[in-house]
Amino acid sequence: MNSNYKLDIAYIAGLFDGEGNVSYKKYPKKRKGSKKDYMTWNIRLEISMTDKDVIELVHETLGCGTFHKKPPSKGQLGKKMQYRWRCGYRDALHVCKLFWPYATVKLHKIEQIIDHYEPDIQELGDNVVDLEKERFIRTQWP
């Protein structure tokens, strides 16, 4: 891993902490041919903004998720094109592990996603990992 990659991850993690959205919730969903609702997980990360270059950097650096544009609706004349990066489920786990050392505002939600997929990592009452040690290791430059 080169230092530019680490810098890009740190930048994107900070951007995500301020501008991103974490969806981690259960909701009822019907399966085909069934009358009964089943609880289904929705696990997703998203960043939306009008700066295309930044969203392209996010998509290229993280190497997962989708990049697409959302034009303003007809009633929003004069508004800018919005660009969006999204990832979900196992890709969200991968990204959460990258963002975790840098997260502050969304740390709890990021840890929930990591715990959802890797519950055996922690003991009861512990954090996902030793926060101080992991942040030190992940932020050291080669």
Predicted features by range, described:
Residues 1-142:
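Internal intein/HINT superfamily modules and their associated LAGLIDADG
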